[in-house]
Amino acid sequence: MSSAYYIRDGYLSQDSVRIKLIRGVTQFQISIPPISIQNTTLGKQFLVLLNEYLSLEPHDMDAYMRPLDLMLGHFLQVLMELAPRVEVKGLSIESFVYAPTYKLEVFGRANGDEVRIKGIEKCFWEPGYDVAPLSVLEAPDSWTAILKTQARDLYLVRGEQELNPLKSLQGKVQTTEGRTTFFRPKERGREKEFLREVEMLLRIKEAGLAGSAHRLPSFEGLVVAGENQDQVIVGFLVNFIVSPSLGSHLLSPGIKSQITLHQKWENQVRDTVKTLHEHDIVWGDANPCNVIIDEKMDAWVIDSGGRNNAEFVDDDDKAETKEGDLQGVQRLFGEWLSGVGDLEVELEIHSFHRGNL
């Protein structure tokens, strides 16, 4: 069954309800002022569910969704008319850089029981999926000579293994020539990590370490949108690593269960990290999702953005250091993967929810 919408972010209080949701490539920013609908039948039902959610500690996701599903269900036909296409496969990356955006507000009529929504007549075009474009004029001088691919020439490819193809634009894409590669978007809130990762990928490439020999990603250039002075950087490309049907990284249950290969993967990761350190390059983000297993069942080290995972590397003094890399590898294989100790991985939860109506 197709998803009616995905909620990516939301703020709920007794005085204000604001949500951001997407349907296909279209995004909606919806404001629901409780005071404006409190005298309507729908508004009263909404407020009962809202107060039930706010009374819970800790907050519950199902309770969080109940008032939103009630209100969004009431306006689902409007959302469907404004965003008739749900499927994103085959769309260009540029479609998400300039995504149709509606800023809507729910309100109750002064005299009557009807709840309406306003703002449907005006469409804005803004970056979607948390893409945070960077002007080429503001990019480091060292990026000037980097190969650049237009976002309009890259198309989304979604695999069956993906739990939620709408969580991020990151993933497999195809060029107009039919070549498969991997797109990493520049996302809001991760600007520093993006800059660091590009610099590390450049250093890996310049040192001749990229590729299968050392199991490190090959930097294939930046992704841009627009032309001339208005051109912006929206991401970069690296080679796409083909994984087995079992999964793609150490956190995948099918991969993690391959106990006989754990030592091999540990040795490979240690060798790769050692090679990086010999060239004064720090991995900076040791965690299960950043060890990719390819179709030959070999372990690759990816993601040098430096967004440190405190479960594996101590934030206070070891983040983005060689010592931190070694600590991370030890905790990853010596504790987490082996099951020794009580180390647990706390996954980052993206604030979105699939709504099937």
Regions found by a protein language model. Give the residues of each.
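Phosphate/pyrophosphate-binding loops and the adjoining catalytic core of nucleotide-dependent enzymes
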Residues: M1-K186, E191-K192, M200-L201, P217
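Eukaryote-biased feature marking scaffold/signaling PDZ-domain proteins and nuclear chromatin regulators
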Residues: G178, H214, Q231-I233, I281, ...
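Conserved protein kinase catalytic core
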Residues: E227, S245-L246, V291, N309-E311
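C-lobe/activation-segment region of protein kinase-like
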Residues: I259-K264, E278-G284, I292-L357
